[in-house]
Amino acid sequence: MTKIAMANFKSAMPIFKSHAYLKELEKTLKPQHCDRVFVFPDFLGLLPNAFLHFTLGVQNAYPKDCGAFTGEITSKHLEELKINTLLIGHSERRVLLKESPNFLKEKFDFFKDKKFKIVYCIGEDLKTREKGLGAVKEFLNEQLENIDLDYQNLIVAYEPIWAIGTGKSASLEDIYLTHGFLKQHLNQKMPLLYGGSVNTQNAKEILGIDSVDGLLIGSTSLELENFKTIISFL
């Protein structure tokens, strides 16, 4: 399977730097990168999607066409921007913004009906990890049970919560074992990504694991040269 690199800017990228980054990345890449390289700016960092060399996505959207949803972006906004790729279930939205499994299912079903490419994020906390692989499997199974795993436009991203933004990536053995379990659980044709303190030093080794189909990269991707380095490993 072709490897994938995704950049998640979260809320850390200045608006105009984001715009410049997207334009420069478009110049750097080639058409064959379009289905392999994804960028998720925040809302103000988005541009109308005329990019041919990578896929532009959004970090979040509300599961309605439009309406009285103060502060939210909806499918009509995304349609106007020609964006049809979306992150759902990132741990920061689950934990900090209290998005429940039922609400995540509502989002998933809504954007599935719109035929969006969905990147669905899962991952356990440190307390669960310390209980062992059996507890991790049970936790991840519960996170996946509400969504249609046969949806053809689905990508799953495994991001252990304890490794996000901490500088402490999961060990290669942890990734190998967890991805091995997930690959057995998921459709074999579905891309399965790893995220959690990915950087230019560990990306190549992680991509070398057969069950890792790509990377979801946070803070390291904020510098274009770092992201280009990781893309070169694909």
Swiss-Prot record:
The protein's annotated pathway: Carbohydrate biosynthesis; gluconeogenesis; Carbohydrate degradation; glycolysis; D-glyceraldehyde 3-phosphate from glycerone phosphate: step 1/1
Q: Which domain of life is it from?
A: Bacteria
- Which residues are the active-site ones? H90 (electrophile), E159 (proton acceptor)
InterPro entries annotated for this entry?
Aldolase_TIM, TIM_sf, TrioseP_Isoase_bac/euk, Triosephosphate_isomerase, Triosephosphate_isomerase_AS
List the CDD domains hit by this protein, alphabetically: TIM (cd00311)
Q: Which EC number applies?
A: 5.3.1.1
The entry marks the following residues as binding substrate, namely N8, F9, K10, G165, S197
- Enzyme class at the top of the EC tree: isomerase
- Principal localization reads cytoplasm
User: Catalysed reaction per UniProt?
Assistant: D-glyceraldehyde 3-phosphate = dihydroxyacetone phosphate
**Molecular function via GO:** triose-phosphate isomerase activity
Q: Which residues cross the membrane?
A: none
Looking at the keywords, is Ligase present? Answer: no
One biological process term from GO is:
glyceraldehyde-3-phosphate biosynthetic process
Q: Which Gene3D superfamilies match?
A: Aldolase class I
Coiled coil stretches, renumbered:
none
Please give the GO cellular component terms listed in this UniProt entry: cytosol
Report the subcellular localization.
Cytoplasm
Q: What are the entry keywords? A: Cytoplasm, Gluconeogenesis, Glycolysis, Isomerase
NCBIfam families (UniProt xref): PRK00042.3-2, PRK00042.3-3
Subunit structure, interactors included: Homodimer.
Family the UniProt entry places it in: Belongs to the triosephosphate isomerase family.
Query: What does the protein in this record do?
Result: Involved in the gluconeogenesis. Catalyzes stereospecifically the conversion of dihydroxyacetone phosphate (DHAP) to D-glyceraldehyde-3-phosphate (G3P).
- Name of this protein: Triosephosphate isomerase
Native organism: Helicobacter acinonychis (strain Sheeba)
Task: Give me the gene this protein comes from.
Answer: tpiA
